[in-house]
């Protein structure tokens, strides 16, 4: 009885870690898509500022991707 409840709790913990990694990936994908779309709108409005907009877009996307990578690594360490 006790062993089965411990195994069930461990399984739920692994499921939670996997869901956390999945949500982090989905959130990063949506965030980077939003960044790209907004940057394209801004470049369409002001083509002369495309260099600065593109630089800021790449930096912001890198920060979002870095946060997502940290979340995925943390979830991977917690799964064991």
What residues fall within each predicted segment?
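Hydrophobic, small-residue-rich transmembrane alpha-helices and their short perimembrane loops
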Residues: 1-80
């Amino acid at each position: 009885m006790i062993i089965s409840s411990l195994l069930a709790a461990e399984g739920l913990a692994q499921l939670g870690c996997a869901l956390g990694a999945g949500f982090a990936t989905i959130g990063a994908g949506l965030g980077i898509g939003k960044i790209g779309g907004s940057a394209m709108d801004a470049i369409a409005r002001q083509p002369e500022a495309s260099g600065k907009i593109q630089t800021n877009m790449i930096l912001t996307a890198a920060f979002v991707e870095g946060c997502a990578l940290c979340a995925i690594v943390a979830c991977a360490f917690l799964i064991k």
